[in-house]
């Protein structure tokens, strides 16, 4: 499994749950969660393969910033 970590500006738990649902619809075999306690509002995705550009696109299309943490 690969793990990719993203920095976001998602601050509301309810919205993070909606975004997780959208991401799970696109990536059904992935484990996806937000760490809302972290200052970078971390989005963590674990899967066999990950398409960071698609994840970023989904968050951006919902009005949120998202970038891969390096």
Q: Positions of the model-derived regions?
A:
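Short amphipathic alpha-helices in soluble, non-transmembrane regions
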Residues: 19-23, 55-63
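Short glycine-/aliphatic-rich beta-strand segments at the starts of folded cytosolic domains
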Residues: 1-11
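Gly/Ser-centered flexible loop/linker motifs
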Residues: 28-31
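Short amphipathic alpha-helix segments
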Residues: 10-26
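A generic structural motif
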Residues: 41-45
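Short Gly/Ser/Thr- and Asp/Glu-enriched loop/turn motifs at secondary-structure junctions
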Residues: 36-40
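Conserved short beta-strand edge segments in small beta-sheet-based binding/regulatory domains
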Residues: 33-34, 63-70
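Helix N-cap motif at beta-to-alpha junctions
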Residues: 47-52
């Amino acid at each position: 499994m690969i793990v990719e970590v993203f920095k976001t500006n998602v601050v509301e738990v309810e919205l993070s749950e909606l975004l997780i649902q959208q991401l799970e619809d696109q990536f059904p075999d992935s484990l996806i969660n937000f760490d809302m306690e972290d200052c970078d509002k971390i989005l963590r995705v674990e899967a066999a393969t990950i398409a960071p550009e698609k994840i970023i696109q989904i968050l951006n299309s919902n009005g949120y910033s998202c970038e891969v943490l390096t």
